[in-house]
């Protein structure tokens, strides 16, 4: 029952966020796919969750998505744009943070953090320009594009445009935390 409620809430947030302004088109250099992504299966027939699960670099993210019961929602049709922190990004959080977030009593907080990394629609690196866009958590993400590099809040996109059947993944070097 809780999973169904989460899916309904997730769908409602998606609908709400789709009504918000989206990132406009702009020219920018596309970041070359790095070794981080070359390990992933980038078959566009796979969902965002399947692509992430197929890459050890995202094992902490995948564990968090499972703990938050977001696998089904992020495997839905979408499309979604996911800013995916690497294992190193999670490891840079203060000691004990990840372990604490994975506890059942912190599930709502984990859902908010994870949905803060997701934007409705498929936004490629070439479409990003400086400005704000609403995340599925209902909070705005701030984008800055400078010298062909994209920053999302304080995180840097280190690999862009990893295609999936239900959207696109951009790999980031930090976990971005929503206002709590």
Curated annotation (Swiss-Prot):
Signal peptide extent:
1-26
The cellular component terms of Gene Ontology attached to this UniProt record, alphabetical and capped at eight, are: outer membrane-bounded periplasmic space
Which InterPro entries does the entry mention?
A: Adhesion/Biosynth-related, FAS1_dom_sf, FAS1_domain
What keywords sit in the KW lines?
Signal
- Specify whether Signal is a keyword of the entry: yes
Keyword set includes Signal: yes
Spell out the SUPFAM superfamilies in the cross-references.
FAS1 domain
**Which residue numbers delimit the FAS1 domain?**
45-176
Descriptive protein name: Protein sll1483
Which species is this UniProt entry from? Synechocystis sp. (strain ATCC 27184 / PCC 6803 / Kazusa)
């Amino acid at each position: 029952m809780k999973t169904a409620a989460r899916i309904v809430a997730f769908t409602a947030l998606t609908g709400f966020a789709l009504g918000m302004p989206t990132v406009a088109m702009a020219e920018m250099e596309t970041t070359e796919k790095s070794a981080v992504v070359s390990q992933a299966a980038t078959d566009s027939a796979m969902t965002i969750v399947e692509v992430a699960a197929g890459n050890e670099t995202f094992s902490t993210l995948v564990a968090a998505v499972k703990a938050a019961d977001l696998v089904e929602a992020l495997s839905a049709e979408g499309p979604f744009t996911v800013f995916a922190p690497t294992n190193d990004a999670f490891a840079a959080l203060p000691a004990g943070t990840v372990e604490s977030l994975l506890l059942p009593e912190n599930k709502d907080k984990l859902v908010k953090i994870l949905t803060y990394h997701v934007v409705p629609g498929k936004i490629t690196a070439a479409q990003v320009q400086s400005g704000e866009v609403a995340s599925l958590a209902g909070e705005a993400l701030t984008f800055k594009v400078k010298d062909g590099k994209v920053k999302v809040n304080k995180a840097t996109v280190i690999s862009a445009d990893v295609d999936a059947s239900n959207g696109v993944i951009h790999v980031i070097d930090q976990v971005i935390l929503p206002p709590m």
